[in-house]
Amino acid sequence: MQTHSESKYRYLFGNIIAFLCGNMGTRMIGFLMVPLYTHMLLPAEYGEMDLLLSVAGVISPLLACGIHEGIMRFALDKGADHSLVLSIGLRVFAIAAVAFLPVCALLEAIPILGGNGWFLYGYCVLNELMTIMLCYIRGCDNTRLYAFLGFLSALFTALLNIIFLVVLGMGLGGYKTSMLLSPVCTVAAAFLMGRVKRDFHPGKWHTGLAREMLRYSMVLIPNALLWWCMNASDRFFVSYLCGTAANGIYAVSYKLPTLLSTVAAICMQAWQMSAIREHEERADHRFSQEIYVLLTFFMGLVTQLMLLVNKGLLRIYVSEAYQSAWLYSGPLMIAFFAGSLGTFWGSFYIAQKRMKKYLLSAVAGAMVNVLLNLCLIPWIGVMGAAAATLASYVVVWWVRAAGIQKDVGVALVSRPLISAFACSAAGMLAAYMTEPWSVALGVAAMAVYVVVNRAYVLSLLHRGKAVLHTWRKRQ
């Protein structure tokens, strides 16, 4: 008979597998498309597009008051009226999208954006609508469809880019066109395949619930903007102080760390749903503690593996003009490792809807990021931006953990945590040495990490076998 603990792991691992199938396919498509972009676009063009997408990261949270976050969280509540949640969310989105039209004139007038105001507005509106659809499907606990639609979105983007960049040879204009058409295709697929068509009723409204959803979502607007500061403001500093070509190379340096971020996102999307369940069931803290330790070990292992293959992979992955990007990937990988830990602690705030305290961590991280960008980029160039990102992610993780650790009963410091940071730092520094020493020391750092944490290797294998055994019995 399946125990309560086993059912928790089954639910968590089941969601991880669903998100893995969708997200890894999505990221792999995006990852494999980068060589096409770097061959078809000049570094300055790639840097310009990266800058526009960074600006879109500021506009998107403001556009619809972050209502997609409220849709997902309130749809996950026990006994939620999904139709009402969706109808409120789409009405808020429609009103906000129309109200935001005058901002286009302001965007057109900003010189650095090069007259791309209407493109930014269209891109943000279409992507926000797509995000609302996906968040609603996820909020209905339909993780398989959510993951599949995410994969489909990436596939649409890839196919459209091949058509406009390679077949039609439209250059940067073709890249922009594909970025507008891809979310349209995904929205159509979500509308037809999900419950959106059945559940949306324009006349359905509840003022009390709408206020709750907006209150929850609007706190996340400054949070999203502050995360933008940590993730994208360095692009502006690098573009201004080092040039758009340097920013294009820096943008490529994010590609391998983004794969690490994808692994973390898969685990965290699944964990967030488990954390909400744990909160609603008033469960004890042992499950959360076990997951935190295992997550720390696993993400530390993935980080060191990525550090080991970073330099060699970029040599065959991008054109020669971009190959110096490996220099900046190391600090970004460790930053994303710290970010995955911060996201774990953030899930407790989301489960308890304690959004003001959640916001404080982003404030601290953004302040550190901007200050260090101002100080370090003029001094050490692009490496200063990578170092600032690393420091800001560590600050967010620490502030979040310190703010809620006692309430959730999860220990912050563990053997996997200390060894992960130590061995990852050793692996990062080894990469700057000449070969074969860099490879040898990187492998040695990973071997030490596995030996020190061998008990957690066995624990992961044991849990995985138990879940597989349960699934086989149900077949």
What are the functions of these language-model segments?
Residues 63-79, 257-292, 346-351:
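Helix-loop junctions and terminal segments of transmembrane helices
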Residues 2-8, 12, 118, 168, ...:
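Interhelical loop/hinge segments that connect adjacent transmembrane helices in multipass membrane
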Residues 74, 127-152, 333-364, 404-406:
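Membrane-interface junctions at transmembrane-helix termini in multi-pass inner-membrane proteins
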Residues 107-123, 307-337:
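Interfacial segments at transmembrane-helix termini and the short loops linking adjacent helices
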Residues 30-45, 167-168, 225-259, 270-277, ...:
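Helix-terminus/linker motif at the lipid-water interface of multi-pass membrane proteins
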Residues 8-68, 154-158, 162, 215-245:
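Signature of the first transmembrane helix
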Residues 2-4, 431-475:
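Membrane-proximal transmembrane or re-entrant/amphipathic helices at the cytosolic face
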Residues 149-196, 363-368, 382-403, 443-449:
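Hydrophobic alpha-helical transmembrane segments
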